Amino acid sequence: MNVTSLSFPYGESIQWFCADNAKNLPSSPLKEWLLAPGSLTQKLKGCCDKFEVKILGEGQCAPLEGEYPKQNAVWVREVLLCLDSVPWVFARTLIPQSLLSTRQADFLGLGTRPLGELLFSQDSFVPGRIEIARFTTDSRLAQLAQSLAQNVEHELWGRRRYFHHDEEEMFVSEMFLPAAVQAMARL
């Protein structure tokens, strides 16, 4: 896997839309994956023999323009979710500093453990709304996919999910790479 042509953070400024208001959503089955209410990690694990998390980078960063207006600095974690060694999803998580010290979650010690396992195993983290975004074939996400030897012929899609813990909020963005879309069509 060669991702050396880009550097952490890979994310870019994105226009997210409420799933109810998003026009021209992709056709099934990608649409169902984008709108799935449960754990994406669990859903992905059901499609492979070997699931793994490859960390692209993590650290304290300023959020991108419009990404997290209430925060000057957040903990950013960017990973690839791989099924049988093939990257399916690029995930970008933003965690406010105030949540990093919560006893319910060791975000800094996650390593290659999937974040979804942690969030969906804790009652104190409540899944919130899902927003949708589409990415052009010249976006940074498309460049990342191409650096992974995945040909980008069509626009790419992703979702952003809010998770609430007490009065705090964090975001998990999951963008589907071309290999995932192709595999979904065969499921």
Swiss-Prot record:
A Pfam family the protein falls into: Chor_lyase
Residues that bind substrate: 77, 115, 174
Documented EC number(s): 4.1.3.40
Reactions performed catalytically: chorismate = 4-hydroxybenzoate + pyruvate
Compartments where located: Cytoplasm
Cellular compartments per GO CC: cytosol
One record GO biological process: pyruvate biosynthetic process
Location, primary (coarse class): cytoplasm
Signal peptide: none
Gene Ontology MF term list: chorismate lyase activity
Top-tier EC class: lyase
Recorded family membership: Belongs to the UbiC family.
Protein name from the UniProt record: Probable chorismate pyruvate-lyase
Gene name linked to the record: ubiC
